[in-house]
Amino acid sequence: MVAREGGPAPADAAQRIAELREQIRRHDYCYYVLDAPEISDAEYDRLMRELLDLEQSHPELVTADSPSQRVGGQPLAAFRAVSHRVPLLSLANAVDDQDLREFDRRARERADRPLTYVVEPKIDGLTVVLSYEEGRFIRAATRGDGLIGEDITENIKTVRAVPLRLKRDIKSLEVRGEAYLPKAAFARLNEEREEAGEAAFANPRNAAAGSLRQLDPKVTASRPLRAYFYNILHLEGADGVGEQVEALQMLEDLGLPVNPERRYCRTIDDVIDYCRYWTEHRHDLPYEIDGMVVKVNELDQYPLLGETAKSPRYAIAFKFPPEQAITRVRDITVKVGRTGVITPTAELEPVRLAGTTVSRATLHNEDIIRERDIHIGDYVVIQKAGDIIPEVLSVLKEKRTGEERPFFMPQTCPECHSPVSRLKGEAAIRCTSLACPAQAKEGLIHFASRDAMNIEGLGPAVVNLLWEAGLVRDPADLYDLTAEQVAPLERMGKKSAANLIAAIENSKSRGLAALIFALGIRLVGQTAAKTLARHFGSMDQLMKATTEELQAVSEIGPKMAESLQRWFAVPANRQMIDRLAEKGLQMETEKAGDAGVPQTFAGKTVVLTGTLTTLDRREAQRLLEERGAKVASSVSKKTSLVIAGEAAGSKLEKAKELNIPILSEADFLQLIDRV
């Protein structure tokens, strides 16, 4: 072979490229994972420049796992949705020692052998899931709603703490972790943004999330993100592990960063001591933490311990006591919500609290104001409940000067001037008008929200524009909009208008459960909406249901039944439902007649495993739940059925061991007539 002019022969280049990649990977690991660099920044830069020059001269030698591929590729048009192999549950919270002891007691009652624990700091960052095949990084996704996240592969490549190649070529590995921005990096980033005239990030978590959700990976690459990993979600081609401490060690041995502050605890007393230590020393860490994560160490006990609908019973998050600050109440304002509730808010002199600047705090309702004797002009102690929502905890009455003024809730709605009322047994004061514009606008915002009709681009600002232009007054009006009507509005234009109309059109297929939730009926949340859709099968049957029939449905109590009856009794609401039906929104569950969907899996606990080729996991779960199934994430003796897709792993093996019936994806589709 003839060498290219001015450069080494391809064979020599390939050898040198391999050497450089290995050196750079090792130095990345020492610097970003071990925090113990072996060479200077200048020497590191020299190695990287040499690699980039060689790869530019020999593009045929560039590979996806080369360190050069971290610099950031072409901007993305949008993030692709990714179905998670395993549902990513959130953790229940413990706020004191008693909660931890209660968690320990419940776990031991369900377990069939003694338990120990693993405890580590709960980093306040963005949850990410990494996938590796044959030891090579192939995909990264955000948590999303726990079932479906967003593909952030190109962005995660730029995080140098994340290995693009593992130290062993394991056939298949999926891990969960947390990406974060160190405190010092966060401070520098905000200084740069302020100098550039850009808005500063409120906290490191927002900065990490904003960095990883950049459509341009080069922006992500410019921000020094780090990550720690803590869960093996899927493993194939390697010996499994029996304990969480072994799982963490395996991750570390593979080259993935694992928190060095993790600790093995033999007893709940040891757990409590460690949580107390970090409660006092949390600010010593170079990153923000908002608590500690406590996990049962014995992985074989997880199926016995089980899960609730939202969280596992084998792990819990110990939340630190909220931080507090003192500031002054400059004013008290009120806002009308979508159900007419008028909520007071304290306008505060800005103060730093738990890493963010706080200028407002919720006062919840008039009773809270009276109980705490809060006046305009008072100095107050504020805290963040869960370090998230600011609230006024108490008043420093010794600081009063006599110039403070008491606050009284309005007797009429501040938006429409209709009378307000307070229902018996409730603290909330409500506007009594069904035509209140503030309620209607908040209702439109809720209707378009992600968990409801998921109309992208229809946030508060756009709703306000449409309202002020007289184009919408209720959700049905949205489906009469045209791009020609929307384009002339402020900050819209032809492209934004076309995108909005397309998003509104796409929302028609969201399904009955989403529509019921989107209507904003008081007390009817997502879970209740799904239950009602599954039980009645159609909007028409739901509207016809009597109070007794509603209360006969599991999870629907007297208050919710009464709320549903009241809402459907309003002629304007029924007329709006008719208009939505005319516009083509789904008013029935799929394949539902008057009797609803056949309850093929009624009373059965079903586990999905492997990769489904025809359906995504969320759709399969929806179809199962519509037909009466309870979908679980792990196989146990209580499992009735396992549906196995391609590359099904340990769950399938366990199902075979327990003699649990197994269906292929094709069998499942045939059973529900979806072939």
Swiss-Prot record:
The active site is at 122 (n6-amp-lysine intermediate). Zn(2+) binds at residues 413, 416, 431, 436. Residues 596-675 form the BRCT domain. Keywords: DNA damage, DNA repair, DNA replication, Ligase, Magnesium, Manganese, Metal-binding, NAD, Zinc. NAD(+) binds at residues 41-45, 90-91, 120, 143, 178, 295, 319. GO terms for cellular component: cytosol. One of its GO terms (biological process) is DNA replication. Pfam families: BRCT, DNA_ligase_aden, DNA_ligase_OB, DNA_ligase_ZBD, HHH_2, HHH_5, Nlig-Ia. It catalyses: NAD(+) + (deoxyribonucleotide)n-3'-hydroxyl + 5'-phospho-(deoxyribonucleotide)m = (deoxyribonucleotide)n+m + AMP + beta-nicotinamide D-nucleotide. Its EC number is 6.5.1.2. GO terms for molecular function: DNA binding; DNA ligase (NAD+) activity; metal ion binding. Its cofactor is Mg(2+); Mn(2+). It is an enzyme of class 6 (ligase). It comes from the Bacteria. InterPro entries: BRCT_dom, BRCT_dom_sf, DisA/LigA_HHH, DNA_ligase, DNA_ligase_CS, DNAligase_adenylation, DNAligase_N, Hlx-hairpin-Hlx_DNA-bd_motif. SUPFAM superfamilies: BRCT domain (SSF52113), DNA ligase/mRNA capping enzyme, catalytic domain (SSF56091), Nucleic acid-binding proteins (SSF50249), RuvA domain 2-like (SSF47781). PANTHER family: CHROMOSOME TRANSMISSION FIDELITY FACTOR 18, DNA LIGASE. Belongs to the NAD-dependent DNA ligase family. LigA subfamily. DNA ligase that catalyzes the formation of phosphodiester linkages between 5'-phosphoryl and 3'-hydroxyl groups in double-stranded DNA using NAD as a coenzyme and as the energy source for the reaction. It is essential for DNA replication and repair of damaged DNA. NCBIfam families: dnlj, PRK07956.1. This is DNA ligase. It comes from Heliobacterium modesticaldum (strain ATCC 51547 / Ice1).
